[in-house]
Structure formats: structure tokens, C-alpha cells
């Protein structure tokens, strides 16, 4: 198989893997309400935290990260170039955001994007996690934490391993675009903060 065909196959595989909505499946297995119709209506870890608590949210977070990490890592090991790696990672995120198996109603893609970046290195992963946690602790906005982390991710990547700056920048742009409604609410002071009891929409 040529590298071009391999890349196309990986893009399709990444999208299909991303289309498996772990939030919906975990909620079904746990007997919880459908996250698409409860809380923020967003099938992501933050909304599952509100609906079902920390353990359910942790499962969703792990599975969503794997949807990005596995295709990106496999493609890297197969010798796919950096820009194509970015496209494959974006395909996984687009599967999460617009899942073909769940009527194209998905989440924000934050955990999947992080999963795709994680194989670059533990130092980058720790920097991204630390940034997200610090912003959440300061302001309690999951969406703002995701946006700030996405903005800083290319700079972190350039510092730790500049080979992957372009694909990470591609992922960051997708995350920021996906959060445009959150940005509008933040500017208006209408965004919900992280809470298990209040409406949240940042993940």
C-alpha cells in the first residue's frame, strides 16, 4: 500500500473511531440520561460529570482521549508525515464532533484532540494538563480552560518538539472554532462554570 493510500485509510479509520460516542455509550451502560438531552446537551466528559459523577466522566475522558491517541500514534509509527498526522488527528476530532453513528451530534473534541497530542511526549502532555487545570481553578470555566490551552498548545509543541507544531496548530484552530459559541457567552458573562449541579458546556 502506498503512503498516500495509507494516509487516506488512516483518515477514514480515525473519523470512524472518533464517531463512537463514548459519552452516550457510557451513559447507556450506567443507566444515566442521554447527555445530548440533559445538562448542556453536549456529549462530552464535562457534561457527563454533571449527569453521572466523576467515575462516569473519567471513563468518557479516557475513551475520548484514546480515539485521538491511537490513530495518531499508529500513523506516526507507520511513517506518515507531520502534516498528514495533523489531518488524521483532525479526522478523529471531526468524528467526535460530527459522529456518523449518532446523527452527527457530538462533543467539542477537546479530549480527543488532547489524546492526539499526547503521544508527542509526556512533557507536552503535562504542560497542557497543567494549563487546563490552572485556568479551571482560577476561573471555573471549562470552556475558557480549553480555549487557553488550545492557544498555547502550538507554542508548547514548538518548544518541546517543533516537528509537530503545524499539526498541533491545526488541532488548536479546530478546537477554538468549535468553542465560538462559548467565546460569545464568555464575552457576555453568560457562560456556565464547572459544577456537577449547574449547566456546563465547555468540553
Swiss-Prot record:
GO BP terms: phospholipid biosynthetic process
Enzyme category, top tier: transferase
Reactions catalysed, as given in the entry: an acyl phosphate + sn-glycerol 3-phosphate = a 1-acyl-sn-glycero-3-phosphate + phosphate
SMART domains membership: G3P_acyltransf
Transmembrane parts of this sequence: 6-26, 56-76, 82-102, 118-138, 141-161
Function: Catalyzes the transfer of an acyl group from acyl-phosphate (acyl-PO(4)) to glycerol-3-phosphate (G3P) to form lysophosphatidic acid (LPA). This enzyme utilizes acyl-phosphate as fatty acyl donor, but not acyl-CoA or acyl-ACP.
Subunit structure: Probably interacts with PlsX.
Protein name: Glycerol-3-phosphate acyltransferase
Organism: Shewanella loihica (strain ATCC BAA-1088 / PV-4)
Amino acid at each position: 500500500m502506498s503512503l498516500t493510500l495509507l494516509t487516506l485509510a488512516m483518515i477514514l479509520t480515525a473519523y470512524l473511531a472518533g464517531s463512537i460516542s463514548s459519552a452516550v455509550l457510557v451513559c447507556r451502560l450506567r443507566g444515566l440520561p442521554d447527555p445530548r438531552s440533559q445538562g448542556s446537551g453536549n456529549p462530552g466528559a464535562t457534561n457527563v460529570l454533571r449527569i453521572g459523577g466523576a467515575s462516569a466522566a473519567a471513563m468518557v475522558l479516557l475513551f475520548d482521549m484514546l480515539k485521538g491517541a491511537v490513530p495518531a500514534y499508529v500513523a506516526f509509527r507507520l511513517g506518515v508525515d507531520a502534516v498528514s498526522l495533523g489531518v488524521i488527528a483532525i479526522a478523529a476530532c471531526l468524528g467526535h464532533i460530527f459522529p456518523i453513528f449518532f446523527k452527527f451530534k457530538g462533543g467539542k473534541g477537546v479530549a480527543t484532540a488532547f489524546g492526539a497530542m499526547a503521544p508527542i511526549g509526556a512533557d507536552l502532555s503535562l504542560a497542557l494538563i497543567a494549563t487546563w487545570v490552572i485556568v479551571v481553578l482560577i476561573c471555573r470555566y471549562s470552556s475558557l480552560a480549553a480555549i487557553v490551552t488550545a492557544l498555547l498548545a502550538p507554542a508548547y509543541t514548538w518548544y518541546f518538539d517543533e516537528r509537530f507544531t503545524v499539526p498541533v496548530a491545526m488541532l488548536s484552530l479546530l478546537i477554538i472554532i468549535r468553542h465560538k459559541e462559548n467565546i460569545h457567552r464568555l464575552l457576555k458573562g453568560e457562560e456556565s462554570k464547572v459544577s456537577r449541579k449547574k449547566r456546563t458546556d465547555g468540553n
